[in-house]
């Protein structure tokens, strides 16, 4: 998937250069993940390893369209952030997002991020909810995989410090001793080029692994 390509790209050319144990998480319309262990892509039995977006973080939460309950994607994706604000605005909640909602019938994740930067209470609430859920998912990765680095990419990563400062604080506070001390959580450095660069790196690795007789 795109997150698998992204982790290869960031490892080869971006934030993860020289880091062989790392996780890439894309937070955009959905939430996905790619994992490197010992410098090699972790795919699992069916090629689906790393799906942080479908980790349950609230056993009493809403049902996602994937069929799971309370998974990270419900709360932390750009779609989930927007849906939370939409529901509150539909219920009459006061917010600087009101004009956009009344005009368009909905808001976007980017609208919410912009409003949060301006101190809007509803937008900050939606972002805090997103951070808590994402942190819970990342902590599962931290305690199972013990990575050196987590790179966050996708549209929501463009929220910058609004996302990264509280996210780091929660993860570092809750990580067990021996897991968080040397862990870095960083934004992507390759931006929208991450997928195509990752595809190139995947092809390079495939060629590397071909038998010399070919």
Task: Indicate where each model-derived feature is located.
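Acidic catalytic patch
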Residues: 1-4, 109
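Active-site glycine-centered loops adjacent to acidic/histidine catalytic or metal-binding residues
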Residues: 2, 28, 199
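ATP-binding/phosphotransfer module of carbohydrate and carboxylate kinases, centering on a glycine-rich
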Residues: 9-19, 41, 56-214
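A gly/ser-rich beta-alpha-beta helix-loop segment of oxidoreductase catalytic cores
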Residues: 15, 29, 37
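Short glycine-aspartate micro-motif
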Residues: 21-26, 32-34, 65, 151
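Structural signature of FAD isoalloxazine-binding scaffolds in flavoprotein oxidoreductases
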Residues: 48-51
């Amino acid at each position: 998937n795109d997150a698998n390509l992204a982790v290869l790209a960031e490892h080869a050319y971006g934030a993860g250069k020289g880091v062989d144990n790392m996780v890439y998480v894309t937070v955009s319309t959905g939430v996905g993940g790619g994992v490197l262990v010992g410098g090699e892509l972790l795919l699992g039995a069916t090629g689906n390893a790393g799906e942080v977006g479908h980790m349950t973080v609230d056993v009493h939460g809403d049902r996602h369209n994937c069929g799971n309950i309370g998974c990270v994607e419900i709360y932390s994706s750009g779609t989930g952030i927007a849906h939370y604000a939409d529901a509150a605005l539909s219920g009459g909640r006061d917010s600087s997002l009101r004009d956009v909602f009344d005009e368009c019938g909905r808001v976007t994740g980017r609208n919410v991020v912009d409003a949060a930067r301006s101190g809007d209470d509803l937008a900050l609430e939606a972002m805090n909810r997103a951070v808590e859920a994402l942190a819970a998912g990342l902590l599962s990765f931290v305690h199972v995989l013990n990575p050196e680095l987590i790179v966050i990419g996708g549209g929501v990563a463009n929220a910058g410090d609004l996302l990264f400062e509280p996210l780091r604080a929660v993860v570092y506070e809750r990580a067990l001793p021996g897991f968080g001390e040397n862990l870095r959580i960083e934004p992507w450095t390759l931006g929208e080029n991450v997928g195509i660069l990752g595809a190139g790196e995947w092809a390079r690795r495939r060629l590397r692994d071909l038998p010399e007789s070919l």
